[in-house]
A protein has these predicted regions:
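A polyanion-binding, active-site-adjacent surface
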Residues: 1-107, 111-153
Length: 153
C-alpha cells in the first residue's frame, strides 16, 4: 500500500524520519522496506472514482478493517490519514468495542485524542491534491509521526 506513488513518497519519508521505517522510499514490493512499530491499512480496498468514496463503498470494506483491528493486539496509537481515514478508524474501533465516546472527535490536522487507552492522531492525507497545493507540507506530516513516536515512548 502506497508503494511506488507520490503519496507513498511523502508517507515513507515521514515514517523514516520518525523511526518507523528503515528507508525513506518504497519503490516496489521487494525493495527492502521494513516497518517497525507500524502497520498500514486502508479504509477502502480500491481507489474510488474521483477520489471520493461513497458511504456504500466505505461500508463494503468495513469488515476488512474490523478484522485487522481484531488481529492487531498491541495497538496504542492510530494515525488517520485524511478525514475519511480518521473517521473510519474511530468508527471501527468503536464498533469493535475497544473504545467508547459520546461525541465523535473532530478532524483537524495533528489533532490528538486519547480514548480508552488508545491515542488517535488526525492528519491530512498525503495526496497530490494536498501536497501540490501546500495544504500539507513535509514538516506538517513529519510532526504527525514524531507525535506518534513520542506517544509510544
Amino acid at each position: 500500500m502506497f508503494t511506488g506513488d507520490n503519496s507513498g513518497n511523502w508517507l515513507f519519508r515521514a515514517l523514516h524520519k520518525a523511526g518507523f521505517a528503515n528507508r525513506p522510499l518504497s519503490e516496489h514490493r521487494n525493495d527492502g522496506l521494513r516497518l517497525t512499530d507500524c502497520y498500514i491499512t486502508a479504509t477502502l480496498r480500491c481507489a474510488p472514482p474521483q477520489n471520493k468514496p461513497t458511504p456504500k463503498e466505505i461500508l463494503n470494506c468495513k469488515e476488512y478493517l474490523l478484522r485487522e483491528i481484531e488481529l492487531l493486539k498491541n495497538v496504542r496509537v492510530i494515525v488517520g490519514l485524511g478525514k475519511i481515514g480518521f473517521e473510519a478508524a474511530l468508527n471501527a474501533y468503536r464498533e469493535s468495542g475497544k473504545v467508547e465516546f459520546k461525541s465523535k472527535p473532530r478532524f483537524a490536522h495533528c489533532a490528538m485524542y486519547k480514548i480508552g487507552g488508545l491515542t488517535f492522531i488526525a492528519s491530512f492525507h498525503p495526496s497530490q491534491q494536498n501536497t501540490f497545493t501546500g495544504r500539507l507540507t513535509e514538516p506538517m506530516l513529519d510532526r504527525v509521526f514524531t507525535t506518534a513516536r513520542t506517544q509510544l515512548q
